Amino acid sequence: MIKTFSFILVAVIAVLFVVLVIRVGSFKSRQVIAEPTQTLAISRAAAVAHLSEAIQRKTVSMPAANAGEFVALHTLMERAFPRVHRELTKESVGDHSLLFTWRGKDQRLKPILLMAHMDVVPVDPTTESSWHHAPFSGEVADGYIWGRGAMDDKESVFAILEAVESLLTSNFRPERTIYLAFGHDEEIGGINGAAKIAALLSSRHVELECIVDEGLNVFTGIISGLDSPAALIGIAEKGYLSLQLSVETAGGHSSMPPEHTAIGTLTGALQRLQGAPFPARLSRPTRGMFEFLGPEMSFDKKVVLANLWLFSPLLEKTLAQSPRTNALLRTTLAPTMLNAGITDNVLPSKASAVVNLRIIPGESIASATQYVRQVIADPTVTILPFPIASEPSAVSNVDTASFAILHKTIHQTIPAAVVAPALLVASTDSRHYRSLTKNIFRFLPVTVGPEDISRYHGIDERISVEDYERCIRFYAQLIINFNAPMR
């Protein structure tokens, strides 16, 4: 009996081993071979000077308070890109946002939309002394352009404009219409910028072939088992929701506290939420990422990624160990604000907190809110949503001509990169354009290493001069490729 069982066990292990090896062997590369491109004439010095000057404009996301800065930025654009302003149609939308239309020769072709935003987040005054170069100096030093907006997102705005200006100078004329949309309030929701541009295009019955917005980057030294840079394209983004949790009690003197105080009840609710994370699962964008990255990785990683039918629990457990990768697995929840009390010897009659949720595709605002209610399980805790919220995006299909063109363009401008779809865990202005196309891709060819993650919205934001020139060439090549016959 024991011998029979041992024989069966060995046979099962042998069959399993064969299946694993066969699946690794059939785990073929999804990368494309791209032909070399013609070199476009670009003045690096002029382009760097333009971006440097743009960073000096303090276009913080409070347009009413910074109207003069946005006007100055628009004036810089007019001076730096005369052909763009002469040959494209420009419209101001929602006070400070801009929509450029480059009319194509063949109106039967669906247009494409290139997006970026001109506004930036503020700089915490307490951190200014920690910057190596002043945050709004636009300093060019050590091979970098420094300052707020260098990575998010003035480099996109100006790279797109530099690309179009250079193409116009070379007498390029597009077959399909190209829209350039630059928002002025992306960092605070995009309600008066991108949302109004999208509404304007919708009122004109515009149907887009695809949208390319900011988003994921070219990551180096971040993905274990991958030696090459990873160019990740956001094919979906998480939803956004903030909930206010509040508790009201009678208050009173702190020398005679009741069994349940407002602060105690609220902190108990927060502790329960922290102890019950949303369920983990490999969403379609994350599975797609591993399908594209896996064949290019070391053998041990290939075995796991080629056999997710067996190893997905192991992969989920591994990803959950890091905040950066845990966000790919589940809806995340983080307390971000607390408010209670007026002095040390008075029980507050009200305590409140705000929790911010980033909702994974496949879930919804309603389901996430219901999960929070179930975990808190306390009717004395009032739960109210903030007015600005967005559902998770649809997942764009990678088996389309638009994705293939973007994939090809990345390989033409960054030959060493491994291209893969992925999930963007943040939110972008592209969510306002969802009704105009199913093909929305979030990518910017800026190199990001482990030390650069904290620069986004943080200290020492910068972009290398080399990366910035590559951004310009990327957008120019993308426009050229979208105006060749699509297969």
Regions found by a protein language model. Name each.
Residues 12-150, 169-174, 355:
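Acidic/His- and Gly-rich active-site-bordering loop/insert found
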Residues 26, 30-34, 201-210, 217-228, ...:
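Acidic-enriched catalytic cores of C-N bond-cleaving enzymes acting on peptides and small amides
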Residues 42, 90-91, 101, 107-109, ...:
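An extended, acidic, His-containing surface patch that forms the Zn2+-binding/catalytic region
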Residues 65, 123-128, 190-194, 222-225, ...:
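Short, solvent-exposed loop/turn and secondary-structure capping segments
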Residues 129-130, 171-173, 234-240, 327, ...:
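Short glycine/proline-enriched loop/turn "hinge" motifs that connect secondary-structure elements
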